[in-house]
Structures are given as C-alpha cells and as structure tokens.
C-alpha cells in the first residue's frame, strides 16, 4: 500500500478549534427537506460590545469580551417546507440559493456570581422563493435578505460593525463565507427585505 499524508495547517492563534463541513441532505419527517453545503466551527475568540446608554459610569465598548464562538453556516442550499415534498404534487414553500450564517457567542469568564452572557446573530439570503401546490395562488420572491441580532440578559449587544465576524458557509473544498456586520447601536434587529410578487 502506498502511504498517504495529510497536512495540518491550523493557526495557533485560533486556539482550540472544532471544525466540520460537508454537503448534507436532511429530510425532517417529510415536512422539511434541505440540501447543500454546511459548515460548523467552534473556537475561542473575542467580541466588542456596544456601549449601553443606561450605564453612564461604564463604557462596555472599551474592553473585548473573551467568548466561546459557535458558528454555523450554509451556502447554495435548496429547501422545501410543506407536505408531499419530493413527490410530483408538493404543497409548500420552495427556496433556492439559500446562504446563511449564525453566530452564538457565550462569555467564557463571567464576573464572579454572574451567569455567562450569550449573544446571537443571524444573517441569511435566498435568490428565490416560491409557494407551490395551490391552484390559482402564485407567490414568488427574489433577493431575500434577513438579519437578526439578540442581546444578552444584561441588554448588551455585540458590535459587529466594530469587529466583523466572518462565518464559514461552505466546505473546505468549496470555500465561501458570510460576514456579520450589524452595529450594536441599532439595538436588537429583526429585519427582512426582498422582492415579492403575488
């Protein structure tokens, strides 16, 4: 047998890293089918917070917070949610060209007696969405974009505009990324945009 080699090339400044990626197809009880490239990364890092107006004696943005970072990303996904998915007569929502990034940041060393703070951010896009399976009803959408941020229990938010978070969304063989860049000054955000035709 011919010996083979594998190169280990992770940078030490990444700290301990757990990383997985690949092409995946999921069928959840016939209701949800998703197929495409997915990536998961777990590592230690730091984030900058936005300053809270309610705490005039403290500027939360001056010190970075060390966190455990869990990121999940996907690219080029197709998805269907509804009934009879994969059959000749499906009814539900069909999505194409889905890309998404999720970052969950958990404080690594909370203040004594305090619970670790946790912040979540989501960014997603899709090139198209169609509602199919109901005669006479045509719903199509394109250029869909979604952004969500969630604050910690103490009302702080990660300021992604001060320190962007790049999330791997593709496989190592076919790399792609998505950047989280929302400013903490916007507060918690839930927003979506796109072109809709009914």
Q: Which role does the model predict for each range below?
A:
Residues 1-198:
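N-terminal low-complexity, acidic/Ser/Thr/Gly/Pro-rich segments
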